[in-house]
Amino acid sequence: VEKRTYSYEDAFQASLAYFEGDELAARVWVNKYAMKDSFGNIYEQSPADMHQRLADEIARIEAKYPNPVSAGRIFGLLDHFRYIIPAGSPMTGIGNDQQIASLSNCFVIGIDGNADSYGAIMKEDEEQVQLMKRRGGVGHDLSQIRPKGSPVKNSALTSTGLVPFMERFSNSTREVAQDGRRGALMLSVSIKHPDSEAFIDAKMTEGKVTGANVSVKIDDGFMRCAIEGRPYRQQYPIDAEKPLTEKEINAAALWKKIVHNAWKSAEPGVLFWDTILRESIPDCYADLGFRTVSTNPCGEIPLCPYDSCRLLAINLYSYVKNPFTSEAVFDFDLFREHVALAQRMMDDIIDLELEKIDLIEKKIESDPQDEEVKRTEYRLWEKIRHKTSQGRRTGVGITAEGDMLAALGLRYGTQEATDFAVTVQKTLALAAYASSVQMAKERGAFGIYDAVREEKNPFILRVKEADAALYEEMRRYGRRNIACLTIAPTGTTSLMTQTTSGIEPVFLPVYKRRRKVNPNDPQVRVDYTDETGDAFEEYIVYHHKFLTWMQANGIDTSCNYSQEDIDRLVASSPYHKATANDVDWLMKVKMQGAIQKWVDHSISVTVNLPNNVSEELVNRLYVEAWKSGCKGCTIYRDGSRSGVLVSTKKKEKKTESAVSVLPLCAPPEVTERRPDVLECDVVRFQNNKEKWVAFVGLLGGRPYEIFTGLQDDEEGIVLPKTVTKGRIVKHTGQDGSKRYDFQFENKRGYKTTVEGLSEKFNKEYWNYAKLISGVLRYRMPLENVIKLVGSLQLESENINTWKVGVERALKKYISDGTEAHGQKCPNCGQETLIYQEGCLICKNCGTSRCG
């Protein structure tokens, strides 16, 4: 039977009705999750069709086992994203015969034994690419690569160390397209490795390792040495009793560098590796192939080589009865019932994944390539199949933690809210483990279950203390899944649940968004024009559950409130002082550590800090994370990579008074006299049909001045396309007039000079260029300069086109990973735009926009 197809507009309108007018959620669903073929045909009209597809497939697996759950009941759990939300890969892939891809969200690869040869490294590189083309994020550990300068028996004579291979793996990630986005990669290394300092510094060089997240695996011994000021011993191999290389380092100095780099650029992340291994249930089976070596790209699933995980989130907000009222209460009975079903559904999805692996292997077999070419990919999926079926690992998580707490009248970051969040997570953990034990009775335990191996595991001991009867049942019957739980960032799925994401607080209860408009329509207001000439109107957006709070408290949601009114509303709401940038930072870290006790995998969470915090605060947060039992910690200091949503509220100064005293901010360093010669980058760009070139003068590697003009025309600037760097030379005449020349070396080393850059400018642009160079000279933060350029209100269409080119040229110098303040992704609407090589990339949906 030929399947019915829908036009984009049909699907969008049906989804718009489904989401009750939420245009952003509707577009996200149609663009990312509706079933499509490679020709763009859409086979689902609304999320109801998708949920029916998922329910039918999961029920098909249920029918293989005793006491099957019906498709109708499963659909009821999924419908309107109310209770259970599979992550993107399962949601897209289950029952989808239009693509051959894995249902797994994340993988870790690696080689057991010696893995420091070129052959082993190239093999991991190929495996990484093969997984990413099937939609998976990948992590792998570099601790087995020998340190720089080690003797090798090849023509090089000594090893190059870790960093060149970081760049190789990063570049491979950037080459792979997954639904129009790049792959996700995590690279980790042990702090014991002699090259760990080079690893920690690798991303501090602009443009390096831009395709990977990097995290350093820190052991308890290092932390104690760093805190107590004692030396620490590094060695290679890191676990060898008789290492080939040893050196003693200043642990405090290396720790200070980790803190500084995290403060400056949000990387590296830290993984408290002894905590991870000590708490890991799969590591009870390390000698059977379940030794944890790295994590997935977001850090919430530590994994052994060739294992994978599929994720699912439970919407906590939906279990609050009478939300935002004095009668609000959490329905623990319904929650336990649904957690048990969620764990069961996750186990069913493992069977569906094994079916997908069958299809992948058949596809590989049928490919026309030579058998030798196909061998690595085929064997890769064989290893993944083996680990998947052997451990049956699941990732049951949560979302809407922030909204749940607000709906109950609890302020995120307080001790009361933390205690309740721990109670909810403990309830979830016990219910999920009880469900896994019940499935072991009905379906059989995972193949290598051994109660004796697990009896001293701290997580299992907590289960035993909390529910002795469950523990005894588990010892008798086993458990269906080697590990069950996680808390992941829920990304775009939180747009469809219309809640806060994962364990995070609300980002902003009120913010600005842009809507494309017809600039010729007299009824609209144009606030922004992008590089293509599209016009946008800015408007105020309320977080969905903030609107629910307003309605529950009899506040008119249709009124056009002033900024002062909005500020008063937020201040009187349960979201006051509970946003991502407002929460008590130490309490957030302690909350993560407390909840971690009831999560057998890990938690992905970010501590958002204002720009003016000191490195000492970052140090205290990291140390507190280690002491609190966190398995990892990520710090993001506002502006360290620049860019987030624009808050509508008036700025309130927040200090570190509760933690440490903040030193006065030093004024920017300004060079009063321009050097006669500045290094210069040449940046080419195209606006409409015109080719432009920008000469960006650099002082200390930072833009100091800019000249732009047309190239390749009679009056323009003619340069070989190979020229990307040079010097801007300033000449001052006897009459005080100034001239700026561009000088470069050709391939043969001869200098060529292009005289009179200022004369190459159209006079129409000259004053604007002087303005921009002026603010660059006086060290305005670069992202603010770009905002200033973008905000220029210019009547001439030509100048508007030119200013976009200037923005594009300057964006090149914003550090990769810098968040884009005040901008939302035009595709998914999330506040997750970051700068990457001068382009804006959405971390959630992968949409990119350059210019």
Please report, for each region that a protein language model flagged, where it lies by residue.
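Catalytic alpha/beta core of large soluble enzyme barrels
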Residues: 23, 27, 299-301, 353, ...
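Function-dense linear segments that define catalytic or interfacial modules
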Residues: 35, 57-63, 77-154, 162-165, ...
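Terminal amphipathic helices with adjacent charged low-complexity linkers/tails
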Residues: 218, 279, 284-286, 296, ...
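Short, Gly/Pro- and small/polar-rich lid/capping loops
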Residues: 471-473, 648-698
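Internal maturation/activation junctions in enzymes
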Residues: 74-75, 235-239, 338-385, 389, ...
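Conserved, charged catalytic cores of large soluble enzymes
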Residues: 2-68, 154-168, 178-290, 321-326, ...
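Cysteine-rich micro-motifs
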Residues: 838-848
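Short, cysteine/histidine-rich loop/knuckle motifs that typically chelate Zn2+
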Residues: 826-830, 844
